[in-house]
Every structure is written in C-alpha cells, then in structure tokens.
A protein has these predicted regions:
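Acidic, PIN/NYN-like endoribonuclease modules and their adjacent C-terminal/linker elements
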Residues: 1-4, 71, 75-101
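PIN/NYN-family metal-dependent endoribonuclease catalytic core
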Residues: 4-47
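Residues within well-formed alpha-helices
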Residues: 8, 48, 52, 71-73
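Conserved glycosyltransferase catalytic-site signature
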Residues: 9, 64-68, 85
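Hydrophobic packing residues within well-ordered alpha-helices of enzyme cores
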Residues: 28, 49, 88-91
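Residue-level signal for well-ordered alpha-helical positions
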Residues: 31, 52, 94-95
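Conserved SAM-binding loop
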Residues: 38, 63, 81
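Mid-chain, well-packed structural core segment of small domains
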Residues: 51, 58, 63-70
Length: 101
C-alpha cells in the first residue's frame, strides 16, 4: 500500500489499509473496520476545491463536491489519488498537478 496516495471510495472498498478521507468513511462506513489512516479537510482544502470548481465550471464539466474536495486534499498534501472514478480525470484536466493512479 502506497503512503503517498489517497484511496478514493471506488478503490477503498477492496483495500485493507491505506489513506482515505473522512468523506470516504461517510460514504462507506464499513471502512471504519479496516486499517485506514483518515484525513480531515483543512481550510486550505476548501479554497483549493473552490478553485477546482471554478475551473471545471468554465470548461462546462462540473463534478461532485466530494470528488473536488478529495482532489483538493490530495493537492494540498502533495499526494496522488488512487481511483476508478472518471471524474478525477476531469479534475486533472484543470489541475494537471493532480496525480492519479
């Protein structure tokens, strides 16, 4: 398990350990029974998420708030996102520094 990546819900479902956000835990409470480190958002994460939202809206490709927040949390901490969710590719278009796996 990589320690330099956040697992999105789409990946965390099958994982036993790693780093997830509180949003993944809320989306899938059984994750609490696994060995995950849980990240909580900071003020800067919301600022970055708003920047992502503005850029996506300008391109006409808005995505869900939770995905934007997870991406923002990864960007703020220089982490990648491991995901099977295509919305993160849309985010990467406007934030190319977002690492995806």
């Amino acid at each position: 398990v990589e320690t330099n990546e956040i697992l999105d819900t789409s990946v965390a479902l099958d994982a036993k350990e790693g780093i997830i956000t509180i949003f993944t835990l809320i989306e899938h409470p059984p994750c609490a029974e696994k060995f995950f480190d849980i990240l909580f958002p900071e003020t800067k994460d919301y600022v970055i998420a708003l920047e992502i939202a503005k850029k996506l809206r300008q391109q006409g490709t808005p995505v869900g708030a939770i995905d934007m927040l997870i991406a923002a949390m990864a960007l703020n901490r220089s982490l990648a996102v491991r995901t099977c969710d295509g919305n993160f590719k849309n985010i990467q278009v406007v934030m190319p520094e977002l690492g995806l796996r």
